[in-house]
Amino acid sequence: MAAAKWLIASLAFASSGLAFTPEDFISAPRRGEAIPDPKGELAVFHVSKYNFDKKDRPSGWNLLNLKNGDISVLTTDSDVSEITWLGDGTKVVYVNGTDSVEGGVGIWISDAKNFGNAYKAGSVNGAFSGLKLAKAGDKINFVGYGQSTTKGDLYNEAAAKEAVSSARIYDGLFVRHWDTYVGTQFNAVFSGSLTKNGDKYSFDGKLKNLVQPVKYAESPYPPFGGSGDYDLSSDGKTVAFMSKAPELPKANLTTSYIFLVPHDGSRVAEPINKRNGPRTPQGIEGASSSPVFSPDGKRIAYLQMATKNYESDRRVIHIAEVGSNKPVQRIASSWDRSPEAVKWSSDGRTLYVTAEDHATGKLFTLPADARDNHKPSVVKHDGSVSSFYFIGSSKSVLISGNSLWSNALYQVATPGRPNRKLFYANEHDPELKGLGPKDIEPLWVDGARTKIHSWIVKPTGFDKNKVYPLAFLIHGGPQGSWGDSWSTRWNPRVWADQGYVVVAPNPTGSTGFGQKLTDDITNDWGGAPYKDLVKIWEHVRDHIKYIDTDNGIAAGASFGGFMVNWIQGQDLGRKFKALVSHDGTFVGSSKIGTDELFFIEHDFNGTFFEARQNYDRWDCSKPELVAKWSTPQLVIHNDFDFRLSVAEGVGLFNVLQEKGIPSRFLNFPDETHWVTKPENSLVWHQQVLGWINKWSGINKSNPKSIKLSDCPIEVIDHEAHSYFDY
């Protein structure tokens, strides 16, 4: 019955254009980055779509015509995990996840214009991905990554011997990271070659581990590292990879290096920017990222932070000469933005970089020899940039992006010219029908110390003469932001279309507004950010007539979850009808149970035992704060969240229950800091939206809104009375 009700609601909303439902949101096609062929005629991208009826997510690969934006199907084979251009016309190399080698993958070669006529070049004896290719004479050299055994072999889970005991024994950190207990395997970059025999290529199955010879090195670095952590020179002879500094404690410091190594592994990899090294700029000890060779292979650009234990420090562009002892050069080092990715133009004279700027991921250009005070130029495009690739040898790039109003924006951007639209998902996908920039607008308010930005997101069919309850959404990080980008988890438009106007603030600590605003949250989690939120809420109450703050709700995840817990004990907590806290800290001293100690040791100005007062300052569980609690609160926490233990959520719920405050605890034993599985995501939305709709009055004003009873999961309740009923 629940499934049928959801289907009917979805059809009703879609046909009348009244709402964007969680089912629409979860089942909308998800498209990956579009990668153009060498001639700049076609681009290939991955696409998947969840089917609620069949409970599966079939996937495949499509081709995008770069002249007219037409899309055609390349393959519907879900086992094809990645495709990359061979560098020869429309020929491609792809990885197939099913192979004759158990636990391995197949390397196949085909032509995008006749994909079914493929042949197998060889097998890799283990999980392997992230292919990058370069011609090297009559061979094609490649690199990719997988997990390494301690001996340096590619790890094959299917072939691994089962341990006689489940014990884990540690003599050092990490014990666990993000969602995984750290084991003996680690990520490594492997190299190999495709050899040409006649008109076909073959692979002999031999891989060289380029990382394992450097003791304690790892690349790509978990949990979010990928193919952007390494690069292959255009002649196929040299590989660059990023690893945390192998000689330093990884849980306490963010310091990482860019290593160079021959493709054949004939020498051990060496760092070009070692801490206090002869080439490294003075005082630069932070995290490195995005290594990329110049087209001629003589230089390498990368990004690096200065501070050794601060993951949200400002990145600066660095350029090093390959095979030289000359000092590394810093480029546009005074630019008050933090680049996220960098690429060279085909002539090696210009750098294209992405960076967050005023809550939008933008594309910029600058000369490769720019001075410190140079300000990069913006390239015009819509939404936020996820990735970009040069189209042939031109100055134009193919951008894959998204926005608050569309989950896929493919467009061509050229410096000094208007962007050219190829494909915008909201104009094609029925699930996204009606979404557009018309319902999004920025809001600037005087905060505690400076002007603070927020996004206002309005529902479908918004009428300025009507009044809508406030949904006050607080982002995580805390060094993060609500950007003009699509979220597959916390999506403001899904909330708005229940009948709210969403206000999504970027308070002190947010990124993309200059490094000072980001840095100012240090040791001030409940200070300036909270004051910013109060001022934004007051501005909305006093100046925006179509927003009803009397029946508003507040919700947040991670740092946003902490802030909701903090708000519960403050005056602002009494201004909301309901609260939602997802994976937020509760007890100040429990932060020591996190995985990345550098994070808390930076944000609280010291270690747990040397600066304990800083950890206790923003403790949501203080008795004097708990005494003020009264607002109904939904608490969400998952078992595989190793950023902060599930015990935080349980403890918070315990106190809410003992105080007799209407509350509910939602737990996913198979989810992490995030909820990503489709059926779990649907339940999450049913519970979260059902909770706020109940207390805000939306259930009464909008009969089509989600109710708690829409969720088919049985509620567990073994208590007849609250503790304080006795």
Curated annotation (Swiss-Prot):
GO biological process, alphabetically ordered: proteolysis
Entry EC no(s): 3.4.14.-
Lineage: superkingdom: Eukaryota
Gene Ontology MF, one: serine-type endopeptidase activity
Glycan attachment positions: N96, N252, N605, N699
UniProt-annotated stretches for the region Disordered: 269-291
GO cellular component: extracellular region
InterPro entries linked: 6-blade_b-propeller_TolB-like, AB_hydrolase_fold, PD40, Peptidase_S9_cat
Keyword Cytoplasm: no
Family: Belongs to the peptidase S9C family.
Name under which the protein is recorded: Dipeptidyl-peptidase 5
Lineage: Eukaryota, Fungi, Dikarya, Ascomycota, Pezizomycotina
